[in-house]
Amino acid sequence: MVKTVMPHPVGGQPVAISRKIRWGVLGVAGIAVKKVIPAMQKGARSEIVAIASRELAKARQAAAQLNIPNAYGSYEKLLADPAVDAIYNPLPNHLHVPWSIKAARAGKHVLCEKPIALSVEQTAELIETRNATRVKIGEAFMVRTHPQWLRARDIVMGGGVGELKAVTSTFSYFNRDPNNIRNIVAVGGGAIMDIGCYPITMSRFLFGREPSRVIGFIERDPDMGTDRLTSALLDFAPGHATFTCSTQMVPFQTMQILGTKGRLEIEVPYNIPPDRPSCLFLDDGSELAGRSAEVEECIEMDQYTIQGDEFSRAIQEDGEVPVPLEDALRNMAVIEALFRSAGTGRWEQPQAYAADSGS
Protein backbone atom coordinates (compact mmCIF):
# COMPACT_ATOMS: atom_id res chain seq x y z
CA MET A 1 0.00 0.00 0.00
CA VAL A 2 1.32 3.44 -0.98
CA LYS A 3 0.06 6.51 0.85
CA THR A 4 0.74 10.03 -0.42
CA VAL A 5 1.79 12.57 2.18
CA MET A 6 1.04 16.20 1.48
CA PRO A 7 3.56 18.93 2.32
CA HIS A 8 4.18 19.36 6.02
CA PRO A 9 3.42 22.87 7.34
CA VAL A 10 6.98 23.97 8.07
CA GLY A 11 6.34 27.46 9.36
CA GLY A 12 3.39 29.21 10.91
CA GLN A 13 0.12 30.21 9.30
CA PRO A 14 0.43 31.85 5.86
CA VAL A 15 0.48 35.64 5.85
CA ALA A 16 0.17 38.19 3.10
CA ILE A 17 3.58 38.75 1.54
CA SER A 18 4.19 42.43 0.82
CA ARG A 19 7.36 41.66 -1.13
CA LYS A 20 9.88 38.89 -1.53
CA ILE A 21 13.16 38.89 0.36
CA ARG A 22 15.94 40.05 -1.97
CA TRP A 23 18.93 37.74 -1.90
CA GLY A 24 22.55 38.19 -2.92
CA VAL A 25 24.91 35.26 -3.46
CA LEU A 26 28.59 35.29 -2.51
CA GLY A 27 30.55 33.35 -5.12
CA VAL A 28 29.72 31.15 -8.07
CA ALA A 29 30.11 27.77 -6.36
CA GLY A 30 28.68 24.81 -8.21
CA ILE A 31 26.05 24.09 -5.57
CA ALA A 32 24.81 27.68 -5.83
CA VAL A 33 24.73 27.93 -9.61
CA LYS A 34 23.43 24.42 -10.32
CA LYS A 35 21.05 23.81 -7.43
CA VAL A 36 20.35 26.52 -4.88
CA ILE A 37 19.84 29.62 -7.04
CA PRO A 38 17.50 27.97 -9.58
CA ALA A 39 15.51 26.47 -6.71
CA MET A 40 15.25 29.72 -4.75
CA GLN A 41 14.10 31.53 -7.88
CA LYS A 42 11.02 29.29 -7.82
CA GLY A 43 10.16 30.33 -4.29
CA ALA A 44 7.15 32.34 -3.20
CA ARG A 45 9.15 34.41 -0.72
CA SER A 46 12.62 34.70 -2.26
CA GLU A 47 14.21 36.39 -5.24
CA ILE A 48 17.88 36.49 -6.26
CA VAL A 49 18.86 40.05 -7.15
CA ALA A 50 22.68 39.94 -7.11
CA ILE A 51 25.67 37.63 -7.38
CA ALA A 52 29.35 38.34 -6.75
CA SER A 53 32.67 36.76 -7.63
CA ARG A 54 36.26 37.84 -7.20
CA GLU A 55 36.31 37.78 -11.01
CA LEU A 56 33.68 40.08 -12.51
CA ALA A 57 33.52 38.01 -15.70
CA LYS A 58 32.46 34.93 -13.73
CA ALA A 59 29.81 36.90 -11.87
CA ARG A 60 28.45 38.31 -15.12
CA GLN A 61 28.42 34.87 -16.72
CA ALA A 62 26.45 33.39 -13.82
CA ALA A 63 24.10 36.38 -13.76
CA ALA A 64 23.38 36.02 -17.47
CA GLN A 65 22.89 32.27 -17.17
CA LEU A 66 20.49 32.59 -14.24
CA ASN A 67 18.79 35.87 -15.13
CA ILE A 68 20.11 37.71 -12.06
CA PRO A 69 19.93 41.50 -12.53
CA ASN A 70 23.16 42.55 -10.77
CA ALA A 71 26.71 41.16 -10.93
CA TYR A 72 29.64 42.35 -8.82
CA GLY A 73 33.38 41.78 -9.08
CA SER A 74 33.87 41.74 -5.31
CA TYR A 75 31.96 40.47 -2.30
CA GLU A 76 32.32 43.87 -0.62
CA LYS A 77 30.39 45.60 -3.41
CA LEU A 78 27.52 43.16 -3.10
CA LEU A 79 27.40 43.65 0.67
CA ALA A 80 27.21 47.41 0.10
CA ASP A 81 24.15 47.09 -2.15
CA PRO A 82 21.14 48.50 -0.24
CA ALA A 83 18.78 46.49 -2.46
CA VAL A 84 20.05 43.21 -0.94
CA ASP A 85 18.26 42.03 2.21
CA ALA A 86 19.94 38.67 2.77
CA ILE A 87 23.05 36.75 1.75
CA TYR A 88 23.48 33.12 0.75
CA ASN A 89 27.07 32.09 1.52
CA PRO A 90 28.28 28.96 -0.34
CA LEU A 91 31.98 29.86 -0.16
CA PRO A 92 34.60 27.25 0.84
CA ASN A 93 34.28 26.19 4.48
CA HIS A 94 37.13 28.31 5.80
CA LEU A 95 35.45 31.44 4.41
CA HIS A 96 32.04 30.81 5.94
CA VAL A 97 32.60 32.66 9.20
CA PRO A 98 34.67 35.63 7.95
CA TRP A 99 32.21 36.55 5.21
CA SER A 100 29.12 35.78 7.24
CA ILE A 101 30.40 38.19 9.89
CA LYS A 102 31.09 40.86 7.26
CA ALA A 103 27.61 40.38 5.83
CA ALA A 104 26.00 40.65 9.26
CA ARG A 105 27.94 43.81 10.04
CA ALA A 106 26.68 45.21 6.73
CA GLY A 107 23.14 44.62 7.99
CA LYS A 108 22.41 41.55 5.86
CA HIS A 109 20.73 38.39 7.06
CA VAL A 110 22.83 35.30 6.33
CA LEU A 111 22.05 31.76 5.24
CA CYS A 112 25.43 30.01 5.28
CA GLU A 113 26.26 26.60 3.85
CA LYS A 114 27.12 23.77 6.19
CA PRO A 115 29.32 23.29 8.04
CA ILE A 116 28.81 26.87 9.08
CA ALA A 117 32.24 27.02 10.77
CA LEU A 118 35.43 25.07 11.33
CA SER A 119 35.11 24.95 15.12
CA VAL A 120 32.87 25.53 18.11
CA GLU A 121 34.84 28.69 18.86
CA GLN A 122 34.14 30.11 15.40
CA THR A 123 30.45 29.28 15.72
CA ALA A 124 30.34 31.10 19.05
CA GLU A 125 31.88 34.13 17.33
CA LEU A 126 29.01 34.05 14.85
CA ILE A 127 26.50 33.91 17.70
CA GLU A 128 28.10 36.98 19.27
CA THR A 129 27.98 38.80 15.93
CA ARG A 130 24.33 37.88 15.40
CA ASN A 131 23.42 39.11 18.87
CA ALA A 132 25.28 42.38 18.31
CA THR A 133 23.90 43.09 14.84
CA ARG A 134 20.42 41.62 15.41
CA VAL A 135 20.28 40.03 11.97
CA LYS A 136 19.19 36.47 11.21
CA ILE A 137 21.99 33.92 10.69
CA GLY A 138 21.39 30.24 10.05
CA GLU A 139 23.05 27.07 8.79
CA ALA A 140 21.96 25.69 5.42
CA PHE A 141 20.95 22.12 6.23
CA MET A 142 18.31 21.93 3.51
CA VAL A 143 17.10 18.51 4.69
CA ARG A 144 15.82 19.96 7.95
CA THR A 145 12.86 21.68 6.24
CA HIS A 146 11.89 18.96 3.75
CA PRO A 147 8.48 17.35 4.40
CA GLN A 148 9.90 13.80 4.32
CA TRP A 149 12.08 14.55 7.35
CA LEU A 150 9.35 16.41 9.19
CA ARG A 151 7.08 13.44 8.57
CA ALA A 152 9.80 11.02 9.72
CA ARG A 153 10.20 12.93 12.97
CA ASP A 154 6.42 13.00 13.45
CA ILE A 155 6.34 9.21 13.09
CA VAL A 156 9.16 8.77 15.60
CA MET A 157 7.82 11.29 18.12
CA GLY A 158 4.34 9.80 17.76
CA GLY A 159 5.55 6.35 18.73
CA GLY A 160 5.37 4.92 15.23
CA VAL A 161 8.47 2.80 15.80
CA GLY A 162 7.95 2.38 19.53
CA GLU A 163 10.81 3.57 21.71
CA LEU A 164 13.57 4.91 19.47
CA LYS A 165 16.66 2.75 19.90
CA ALA A 166 18.95 3.12 16.88
CA VAL A 167 19.58 5.46 13.98
CA THR A 168 22.07 4.24 11.40
CA SER A 169 23.23 5.96 8.23
CA THR A 170 25.74 5.77 5.40
CA PHE A 171 26.73 8.67 3.16
CA SER A 172 29.50 8.41 0.58
CA TYR A 173 30.86 9.50 -2.78
CA PHE A 174 34.14 9.03 -4.67
CA ASN A 175 36.44 12.01 -5.24
CA ARG A 176 40.24 11.84 -5.18
CA ASP A 177 40.93 15.13 -6.98
CA PRO A 178 43.66 16.81 -4.88
CA ASN A 179 42.56 20.24 -6.11
CA ASN A 180 38.96 19.82 -5.00
CA ILE A 181 38.23 21.81 -1.85
CA ARG A 182 36.66 18.72 -0.28
CA ASN A 183 40.12 17.16 -0.30
CA ILE A 184 42.06 20.08 1.19
CA VAL A 185 42.47 19.98 4.97
CA ALA A 186 43.36 23.67 5.29
CA VAL A 187 40.00 24.83 3.95
CA GLY A 188 37.90 22.41 6.00
CA GLY A 189 37.78 19.44 3.65
CA GLY A 190 37.21 15.81 4.52
CA ALA A 191 34.32 13.41 4.94
CA ILE A 192 33.02 14.50 8.35
CA MET A 193 32.87 18.20 7.52
CA ASP A 194 31.37 17.67 4.07
CA ILE A 195 28.85 14.87 4.58
CA GLY A 196 29.26 13.35 8.05
CA CYS A 197 27.61 16.47 9.42
CA TYR A 198 24.32 15.28 7.86
CA PRO A 199 23.82 12.05 9.83
CA ILE A 200 24.96 13.91 12.94
CA THR A 201 22.39 16.69 12.61
CA MET A 202 19.59 14.34 11.58
CA SER A 203 20.29 11.91 14.43
CA ARG A 204 20.06 14.83 16.85
CA PHE A 205 16.88 15.94 15.05
CA LEU A 206 15.26 12.53 15.49
CA PHE A 207 16.30 11.89 19.10
CA GLY A 208 15.44 15.46 20.07
CA ARG A 209 18.45 15.73 22.38
CA GLU A 210 22.23 15.80 22.37
CA PRO A 211 24.56 12.77 22.57
CA SER A 212 26.26 12.43 25.95
CA ARG A 213 29.42 10.95 24.43
CA VAL A 214 30.78 9.91 21.03
CA ILE A 215 33.52 7.71 19.63
CA GLY A 216 34.96 7.90 16.13
CA PHE A 217 37.33 5.98 13.90
CA ILE A 218 39.08 7.76 11.04
CA GLU A 219 41.12 6.59 8.07
CA ARG A 220 43.04 9.46 6.50
CA ASP A 221 44.23 9.80 2.93
CA PRO A 222 48.02 9.29 3.05
CA ASP A 223 48.66 12.07 0.55
CA MET A 224 45.95 14.66 1.20
CA GLY A 225 45.54 14.14 4.95
CA THR A 226 41.76 14.41 4.88
CA ASP A 227 39.53 11.93 6.66
CA ARG A 228 38.46 9.77 3.74
CA LEU A 229 36.60 7.16 5.79
CA THR A 230 34.99 7.82 9.15
CA SER A 231 32.70 5.67 11.28
CA ALA A 232 31.13 6.92 14.49
CA LEU A 233 28.91 5.97 17.39
CA LEU A 234 26.85 8.60 19.20
CA ASP A 235 25.41 7.70 22.61
CA PHE A 236 21.96 9.26 23.12
CA ALA A 237 21.31 7.20 26.29
CA PRO A 238 18.96 5.49 25.82
CA GLY A 239 19.53 4.89 22.16
CA HIS A 240 22.46 5.03 19.77
CA ALA A 241 23.22 6.55 16.39
CA THR A 242 25.89 5.17 14.08
CA PHE A 243 27.12 6.36 10.73
CA THR A 244 29.84 5.83 8.15
CA CYS A 245 30.84 8.56 5.73
CA SER A 246 33.48 8.50 3.02
CA THR A 247 34.84 10.64 0.20
CA GLN A 248 36.42 7.60 -1.46
CA MET A 249 33.67 5.02 -1.56
CA VAL A 250 30.92 4.12 -4.01
CA PRO A 251 28.23 6.85 -4.04
CA PHE A 252 25.52 5.78 -1.61
CA GLN A 253 23.25 7.10 1.11
CA THR A 254 20.78 5.46 3.45
CA MET A 255 19.02 6.02 6.76
CA GLN A 256 17.42 3.40 8.99
CA ILE A 257 15.49 4.32 12.14
CA LEU A 258 14.73 1.43 14.50
CA GLY A 259 12.62 1.20 17.61
CA THR A 260 11.06 -1.41 19.85
CA LYS A 261 8.02 -1.82 17.58
CA GLY A 262 9.03 -0.78 14.09
CA ARG A 263 11.60 0.31 11.54
CA LEU A 264 11.50 3.43 9.39
CA GLU A 265 13.67 3.64 6.28
CA ILE A 266 14.22 6.86 4.36
CA GLU A 267 14.77 6.04 0.70
CA VAL A 268 16.99 9.03 -0.20
CA PRO A 269 17.81 10.83 3.04
CA TYR A 270 20.05 13.68 1.93
CA ASN A 271 20.06 14.37 -1.83
CA ILE A 272 16.27 14.24 -1.95
CA PRO A 273 15.11 14.25 -5.60
CA PRO A 274 13.18 17.41 -6.52
CA ASP A 275 11.40 15.88 -9.51
CA ARG A 276 9.79 12.73 -8.12
CA PRO A 277 8.13 11.65 -4.88
CA SER A 278 10.42 10.58 -2.05
CA CYS A 279 9.51 7.51 -0.04
CA LEU A 280 9.40 6.46 3.59
CA PHE A 281 9.08 2.77 4.44
CA LEU A 282 7.49 1.92 7.79
CA ASP A 283 7.89 -1.75 8.71
CA ASP A 284 6.50 -3.52 11.78
CA GLY A 285 8.88 -6.44 11.31
CA SER A 286 6.14 -9.03 10.89
CA GLU A 287 7.79 -10.27 7.71
CA LEU A 288 11.46 -10.38 6.80
CA ALA A 289 13.03 -8.56 3.83
CA GLY A 290 10.72 -5.59 4.32
CA ARG A 291 7.69 -7.28 2.78
CA SER A 292 5.51 -5.95 5.59
CA ALA A 293 6.51 -2.33 4.98
CA GLU A 294 3.97 0.39 4.34
CA VAL A 295 5.10 3.05 1.87
CA GLU A 296 4.48 6.77 2.27
CA GLU A 297 5.24 9.08 -0.65
CA CYS A 298 6.06 12.73 -0.06
CA ILE A 299 5.10 14.67 -3.17
CA GLU A 300 7.98 16.05 -5.19
CA MET A 301 9.40 19.27 -3.77
CA ASP A 302 12.77 20.97 -4.09
CA GLN A 303 14.40 21.13 -0.68
CA TYR A 304 16.41 24.20 -1.67
CA THR A 305 13.23 26.07 -2.58
CA ILE A 306 11.73 25.20 0.80
CA GLN A 307 14.92 26.15 2.62
CA GLY A 308 15.07 29.58 0.97
CA ASP A 309 11.42 30.34 1.57
CA GLU A 310 11.49 29.23 5.20
CA PHE A 311 14.51 31.43 5.89
CA SER A 312 12.77 34.30 4.09
CA ARG A 313 9.67 33.63 6.19
CA ALA A 314 11.76 34.00 9.34
CA ILE A 315 12.91 37.42 8.13
CA GLN A 316 9.43 38.57 7.10
CA GLU A 317 7.74 37.36 10.29
CA ASP A 318 10.68 37.96 12.65
CA GLY A 319 10.68 34.29 13.61
CA GLU A 320 13.35 31.67 14.24
CA VAL A 321 15.42 30.49 11.29
CA PRO A 322 15.12 26.77 10.43
CA VAL A 323 18.60 25.86 11.74
CA PRO A 324 19.72 28.48 14.29
CA LEU A 325 23.31 29.03 15.34
CA GLU A 326 22.80 27.36 18.71
CA ASP A 327 21.93 24.17 16.84
CA ALA A 328 24.91 24.63 14.52
CA LEU A 329 27.17 25.01 17.56
CA ARG A 330 25.94 21.75 19.08
CA ASN A 331 26.49 19.94 15.78
CA MET A 332 30.02 21.32 15.60
CA ALA A 333 30.63 20.21 19.19
CA VAL A 334 29.89 16.62 18.11
CA ILE A 335 32.20 16.95 15.10
CA GLU A 336 35.04 18.25 17.28
CA ALA A 337 34.48 15.44 19.79
CA LEU A 338 34.72 12.86 17.01
CA PHE A 339 38.04 14.28 15.83
CA ARG A 340 39.31 14.19 19.43
CA SER A 341 38.10 10.63 19.85
CA ALA A 342 39.85 9.48 16.69
CA GLY A 343 43.07 10.82 18.20
CA THR A 344 42.65 9.46 21.73
CA GLY A 345 40.89 6.20 20.87
CA ARG A 346 38.40 6.89 23.67
CA TRP A 347 34.87 8.13 24.16
CA GLU A 348 34.71 11.93 24.18
CA GLN A 349 32.02 14.32 25.40
CA PRO A 350 30.84 17.10 23.06
CA GLN A 351 31.92 20.32 24.74
CA ALA A 352 29.21 22.91 25.25
CA TYR A 353 30.25 26.52 24.83
CA ALA A 354 29.25 29.48 26.98
CA ALA A 355 27.75 31.32 24.00
CA ASP A 356 25.26 28.47 23.53
CA SER A 357 22.43 29.75 25.67
CA GLY A 358 20.64 26.43 25.30
CA SER A 359 23.45 24.34 26.78
Language model: regions and residue ranges:
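Rossmann-fold dehydrogenase core element
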Residues: 125-142, 162-166
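Beta-loop-alpha module in the N-terminal Rossmann-like domain of NAD(P)-dependent dehydrogenases
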Residues: 66-128
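Hydrophobic residues in well-ordered beta-strands that form the structural core
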Residues: 32, 72, 89, 111-112, ...
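Predominantly a Rossmann-like dinucleotide-binding segment in NAD(P)-dependent oxidoreductases
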Residues: 31, 143-223, 345
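C-terminal helix-rich "cap/oligomerization" subdomain common to oxidoreductases
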Residues: 1-20, 86-88, 313-359
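N-terminal Rossmann-like dinucleotide-binding module
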Residues: 2-66
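NAD(P)-dinucleotide binding in Rossmann-like oxidoreductases
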Residues: 220-227, 236-307, 324, 352, ...
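Short active-site oxyanion
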Residues: 46-50, 85-87, 189-190
